[in-house]
Amino acid sequence: MNIIEGNIRATGKKFALVVSRFNSFVVESLVEGALDTLERHGEVNSQDITLVRVPGAYELPIAAKKLAEKGTFDGIIALGAVIRGGTPHFEFVAGECNKGLAQVSLEFGIPVSFGVITTDSIEQAIERSGTKAGNKGAEAALGALEMVNVMANIEGAE
């Protein structure tokens, strides 16, 4: 039996972070977590990281698609925060963001890591951006690092 796995070292690999400006008080902590993870754990050089800012989570998929079309990135990490309000807007934005990012990954065959937190309250968002519940930006970066290696290992497998 052949087992294909990945590790989190990605020296020489190129990553793009697509980041929502909306709810920046939470998202900036996700960005810090992702960058720290890429550089410290993944050993990715800061020159191999591109950060793209978009207005909100709904715009993340189209920016991720444009980056994937370039063919220069090994992995893309999408970061944002969608916090439930009093209208159905939350479901539309969160759902379309999720579907769009998954479609980019499947269409272009590169990992697109989902670091968009979807919460019922501001308190939950803060918890998931670096306090009680860890940092979902760091977790998304770890997933991207591992998947970049998994994809390379699948490509090289006999």
Swiss-Prot record:
Family annotation (Pfam families): DMRL_synthase (PF00885)
GO MF entries: 6,7-dimethyl-8-ribityllumazine synthase activity
Pathway in which this enzyme or protein is active: Cofactor biosynthesis; riboflavin biosynthesis; riboflavin from 2-hydroxy-3-oxobutyl phosphate and 5-amino-6-(D-ribitylamino)uracil: step 1/2
EC number(s) per entry: 2.5.1.78
Domain of life: Bacteria
Entries under InterPro entries matching the protein: LS (IPR034964), LS/RS (IPR002180), LS/RS_sf (IPR036467)
Catalysed reactions, semicolon-separated: (2S)-2-hydroxy-3-oxobutyl phosphate + 5-amino-6-(D-ribitylamino)uracil = 6,7-dimethyl-8-(1-D-ribityl)lumazine + phosphate + 2 H2O + H(+)
Binding site for (2S)-2-hydroxy-3-oxobutyl phosphate: G86, T87, R128
Binding residues annotated for 5-amino-6-(D-ribitylamino)uracil, in chain numbering: F22, A57, Y58, E59, A81, V82, I83, F114
Active site: H89
Keyword set, alphabetical order: Riboflavin biosynthesis, Transferase
GO biological process: riboflavin biosynthetic process
One cellular-component annotation, GO: cytosol
Record-linked NCBIfam families: lumazine-synth (TIGR00114), PRK00061.1-4 (NF000812)
Task performed by this protein: Catalyzes the formation of 6,7-dimethyl-8-ribityllumazine by condensation of 5-amino-6-(D-ribitylamino)uracil with 3,4-dihydroxy-2-butanone 4-phosphate. This is the penultimate step in the biosynthesis of riboflavin.
Family named by the database record: Belongs to the DMRL synthase family.
PANTHER family: 6,7-DIMETHYL-8-RIBITYLLUMAZINE SYNTHASE, 6,7-DIMETHYL-8-RIBITYLLUMAZINE SYNTHASE DMRL SYNTHASE LUMAZINE SYNTHASE
Subunit structure as annotated in this protein's UniProt entry: Forms an icosahedral capsid composed of 60 subunits, arranged as a dodecamer of pentamers.
Name of the molecule in the record: 6,7-dimethyl-8-ribityllumazine synthase
Gene: ribH
